[in-house]
Amino acid sequence: MVDVGRVTRTAYAEAFGAVTGRPLIKLPQLPGRAESEIFFDALALNAADLNADGEAERLLEPFSKALAAALAAHQDDLTRQGQLLPGAADAVEAVAKLEGTVATVLTGSSRPNAVLKLSSFGLENFVDFEIGGYGSEAYPKGTLLRVAKERASSKHGVSFGDDATVYIADSARDVDAARIGGARSLAVASGRATAAELRDAGADAVLPDLTDTAGLTALIVRLTAPSS
């Protein structure tokens, strides 16, 4: 929904340095990955000297707090240097207003960081963060999707089966997560993967971008219809 990669990279570098005392020279791939996964890869890539067993795991919580603080310090930069993907704002609002629908996020970010990023662009009122799935929980995304479904069921008192859940994805990895976690996958070729790659991955439906709001909501309705 939002592209804030430049600010996120800056925050990662600041948090990594604060926790390890070493500069972040090599940054792992960020999109689609959990913050914990990125941190452990960064330790390996930057040859951080961790002699004690369990030292990397012990540093994860301080790193998560430092990353949240760094992002908060750069909140104004999120909108100055970042951007909403084309059509994202209208799409999020339209999905939230679909009758019988609850909208949340499944993200590699921690909950505080996800809230910060979306609220910076005015999207916080269209997403129920309470039932989301977050990278700070260190689950694979497929498992994290099941956790989010359970949270939604507990809060709303209804079961969200595989055919009643749509994961709007933008990578082959996310399409796999939808299959594992129990959801229909509506993939958007927003840059991380081509439409052909998303179809080959097995996406239930593919859109070129988020600009066709009516088309997006129509696909969600079709994918969750009893006969689909």
Show the residue positions of the predicted features.
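Active-site neighborhood of HAD-like aspartate-dependent phosphohydrolases
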Residues: M1-P31, L43
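Helix-loop "lid/cap" segments that line or gate small-molecule binding pockets
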Residues: E37-G54, A148-R151
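Active-site phosphate-binding/coordination module
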Residues: N46-A48, D53-A73
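Short, acidic loop-to-helix structural element flanking the phosphoryl-transfer center
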Residues: A73-T104
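Substrate-recognition "cap/lid" segment bordering the active-site pocket of phosphatases
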Residues: T104, S109-V166, A172-G181
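Short acidic-hydrophobic, aromatic-tinged amphipathic segments that line or gate anion-handling sites
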Residues: G133, A205-T211
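Acidic, Mg2+-coordinating phosphoryl-transfer loop and its flanking beta/alpha structural elements
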Residues: Y167-A205
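Short amphipathic alpha-helix with an adjacent loop that forms part of the alpha/beta core around
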Residues: T213-A225
